[in-house]
């Protein structure tokens, strides 16, 4: 069993650009490859967990999500970084694509994606973390009984300044970006 780091995609790994409806809009944030490589080298399973409701809403096809994930993995390879698994939820209860328009257990903040990973990847949940740029990621962590780290990239700064004061669930740590979050996790491991 290995610890896992469950990482949100949009706003945490790549620039937050709303719904990415073309592969050319996918841009990695600075330091992401270094952060993931650091986690890889320190024996952490790296898992991407992402809501992609644009599929259900008809903004883009599920194939585009898969192509973006392939591009992301190619870009990370340049930094000797790899992702162990990618899980995403294409559903939304108010979607327009019937196949994906429904309630589900995999849409964050529900913990379905983490529970699936726990079963499939032999994860040590006692030493695992969630990283994301939105409070929904912190709720996601809470629902899986994991510490959540909020990064200040993407929507993070706005979440800290405007949303967090009104929420009862708070992050275990607030990090500048994914690299600082990874470094903080490794300090906790000691």
Language model: regions and residue ranges:
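Non-catalytic pre-domain segments flanking phosphatase-related domains
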Residues: 1-7, 175, 183-190
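Active-site neighborhood of HAD-like aspartate-dependent phosphohydrolases
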Residues: 1-47
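Metal-dependent phosphoesterase signature
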Residues: 14-30, 55-64, 78-81, 96-105
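Substrate-recognition element of Asp-dependent hydrolases with the DxDx(T/V) motif
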Residues: 32, 36-72, 81-95, 141
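Short, electropositive alpha-helical surface patch
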Residues: 59-73, 99-113, 139-145
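Conserved Lys-Pro-Asp/Glu-containing loop-to-beta segment of HAD-superfamily phosphomonoesterases
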Residues: 105-138
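Acidic, Mg2+-coordinating phosphoryl-transfer loop and its flanking beta/alpha structural elements
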Residues: 129-173
